[in-house]
Amino acid sequence: MYDAIRAFFSPILSLPLSLIYEWTGSYVLAILLLTIVIKIALLPVTIKQQKNSAKQTRLNAKVNRIRQKYANNQQKAQQEIQALYQREGFGAANMGCMPMAIQMLVMIGLYGVMYTPISSVLRFSSEKMEAMKKIMAAVIETGDKNARSANMYEIAMLKNYKTYEGKLSEVLSAEDFADLAEFAEKFKFLGLDLSVTPDAKDPSAYWLIPILSCVTALISSIYMYLKQKKQNPEMAKNPAMGCMTFMSPAMSLMFTFMFPTGVGVYWIISNILSFVQQIFTSFVYSPKKVIAQQMVEETILRRSKENTTKLRVENEKK
């Protein structure tokens, strides 16, 4: 399933990435701009998720009253809660499942693009890419940690293109090889080679990427925790919430020592943009503002129904 999703979304995202790279001449800047475009495109989904979260907060008070009323009858309580959700037009799709699913699908596509920088940016033909893959099979078999699997052979190729220049010249034209060499030389961030995997046992400048990835993830997680604690104090008391707050940064730190630096740079960019987006939606679509707007809309709808009913009764009397 994962491979199918990646195979579907990656080609869609690789075209704009290639165009942005041709315009900027910087791979990292191209990733940054593409991620911004995707965040903007998904903003309506994020806003909907924020509004549904606010609506859920408002419904929690009614749900708690139902549970207290039917404390000795869990089946009846669940029936009443479901009836409440139906009246409010609130279902599983509104609870964040659908928006999160959409974002996850796009994220998988982005990961696919990150693991295939050559085919995504330079857009070599599938025949050339397959020939290059066979050349890099030897690197993968040697256990090069930058080519742990066939999924990362393109990143390994960027690191080892000089070593395999002779074999590559047999499958690539002089122009293609020149493009590959130029791209490999630009495949850097702050002077760090994006094809290199940071070594947890060997302190170096590459440690900067895992540290930044962890710190940016931690800031975003703490902000979300404080936000949830304010909106739903009862949920915040759940020990799992505190655990998840630090689990994500810890996993981010661990994984960035397992994957090439380029993947870690993408995570840093994504963490920063997600944090900015969280602040924006929390300010513009704060729960208080959303709930107030919902109450106004419900009042208008209720009065409209009352007026319609009143007119119908008056017409029936005539």
Task: Describe these PLM feature segments.
Residues M1-K318:
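Helix-loop-helix
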